[in-house]
UniProtKB/Swiss-Prot annotation:
BP GO annotations: urea catabolic process
GO cellular component entries: cytoplasm
Subcellular location per the Swiss-Prot or TrEMBL entry: Cytoplasm
GO molecular function per UniProt: GTP binding; GTPase activity; nickel cation binding
Residues that, per the record, bind GTP: 24-31
Source superkingdom: Bacteria
Classification via HAMAP family: UreG
Similarity remark: Belongs to the SIMIBI class G3E GTPase family. UreG subfamily.
Keywords: Chaperone, Cytoplasm, GTP-binding, Nickel insertion, Nucleotide-binding
Organism: Bradyrhizobium sp. (strain BTAi1 / ATCC BAA-1182)
UniProt protein name: Urease accessory protein UreG 1
Record note on quaternary structure: Homodimer. UreD, UreF and UreG form a complex that acts as a GTP-hydrolysis-dependent molecular chaperone, activating the urease apoprotein by helping to assemble the nickel containing metallocenter of UreC. The UreE protein probably delivers the nickel.
Main location: cytoplasm
InterPro entries per UniProt: CobW/HypB/UreG_nucleotide-bd, P-loop_NTPase, UreG
Length: 216
């Protein structure tokens, strides 16, 4: 179904790149996930670009540009100036325009990652903006986060539980947290990551590739 929708969209507009959202609370590891994905996607030959969102700065975009991991021109920044979810859900015009501009500058781009500003468990992406989206939480927030549910955690296409290496240091029962996450999501995918060590990054890249790039 998603493949058919992408084909219809490409035929109706000049937009051909798959668009993937990455949301989650402040400090959960959204930018770190992108940094970890960049070399994996490059190694796989994926032509991609990134759009970041911050409230009143371009901090995350500048971090990626300075990283040396990606051509700085392939990173665009949106300053939300309001609640982070406003520009990815209620009115994603700025992000849509940023994605369109990247596609115009890089005609071969096949994937654009949209990182939302840090938000809460209610944050979701408009399907006018993205084709598929990831929500990132981390164990430092407590192993009860999945049981609190929230639209972001429940509706995302992929839930990433990050910083699993910290579980013993913050008193989190990781096995229970992951089991609860899988239960409340009704079988939708959950991937555990330690981005510092690279744990789980290949699995996230595999999920993106299978879902929107149609590569197995």
């Amino acid at each position: 179904m998603l493949h058919a929708l992408r084909q219809a969209k490409a035929q109706a507009t000049a937009t051909v790149a798959a668009r993937v959202g990455i949301g989650g609370p402040v400090g959960s590891g959204k930018t770190a996930l992108i940094e970890a994905l960049i070399p994996v996607l490059q190694r796989r030959g994926v032509d991609f670009a990134v759009v970041t969102n911050d409230l009143v700065t371009k901090e995350d975009a500048e971090r990626l540009r300075r990283s040396g991991l990606i051509d700085p021109d392939r990173v665009s920044a949106v300053e939300a100036g309001a609640c982070p979810h406003t520009v990815i859900r209620e009115d994603p015009t700025l992000n849509i325009a940023a994605g369109d501009e990247l596609e115009a500058r890089f005609p071969g781009v096949e994937l654009i990652l949209f990182e939302s500003g840090g938000d809460n468990l209610a944050s979701t992406f408009s399907l006018d903006l993205v084709d598929w989206w990831i929500f990132v939480i981390d164990v430092a927030g407590g192993d009860d986060i999945p049981r609190k549910r929230g639209p972001g955690l429940l509706r995302c296409d992929l839930l990433v539980v990050n910083k699993i290496d910290l579980a013993p240091h913050v008193g989190v029962d990781l096995d229970r947290m992951l089991a609860d996450a899988r239960q409340v999501r009704g079988g939708k995918p959950v991937i555990a990551t330690n981005l510092k060590a690279g744990t789980g990054v290949e699995a996230v890249a595999d999920a993106i590739s299978a879902a929107v790039l149609f590569r197995i």
